[in-house]
């Protein structure tokens, strides 16, 4: 409310819920391009004259934007990053980049459950192992949804461990 002269900028998370990543049960939820557009448009027009929007694709609790909203295969990673950036920068609001977005970082590709550090991922894996899920099935969920995807260090170069360290963990 502009008359109250308080907050004039918001971080809205409706877009972050579109695919079910943080729904609590880790089940992917399908969405369509028109649904994505509706959410984005609602915040563009909904704040008209009364506030200012924050524009972002993710943060430390969500998978990497290119892996989540684009295609992170070598063939399409760069195009996906440019598409997401163009969409974000073409909107009204202040863009926020999570560290690594500016160089197109994608989800980490771990090969074992034990490589995940996040407590939410560990609890999910333990629960599903107790239910008899295969490691392959559990890994498919972790590779897509784990918060570890956005919690790896900034990649400095193409060397082993991204030039960040010679130590095996955290990368």
Predicted feature descriptions by range:
Residues 1-171:
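Active-site and adjacent substrate-binding regions of carbohydrate-active enzymes
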């Amino acid at each position: 409310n502009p008359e109250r002269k308080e907050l004039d900028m918001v971080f809205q998370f409706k877009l972050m819920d579109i695919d079910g990543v943080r729904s609590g049960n880790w089940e992917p939820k399908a969405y369509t391009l028109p649904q994505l557009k509706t959410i984005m448009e609602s915040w563009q027009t909904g704040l008209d004259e009364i506030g200012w929007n924050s524009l972002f694709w993710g943060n430390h609790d969500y998978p990497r934007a290119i892996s989540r909203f684009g295609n992170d295969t070598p063939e399409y990673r760069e195009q996906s990053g440019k598409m997401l950036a163009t969409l974000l920068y073409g909107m009204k609001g202040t863009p926020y980049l999570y560290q690594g977005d500016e160089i197109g970082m994608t989800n980490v590709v771990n090969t074992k459950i034990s490589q995940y550090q996040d407590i939410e991922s560990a609890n999910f894996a333990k629960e599903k192992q107790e239910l008899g899920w295969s490691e392959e099935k559990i890994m498919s969920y972790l590779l897509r949804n784990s918060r570890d995807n956005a919690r790896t260090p900034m990649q400095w170069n193409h060397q082993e461990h991204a030039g960040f360290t010679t130590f095996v963990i955290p990368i």
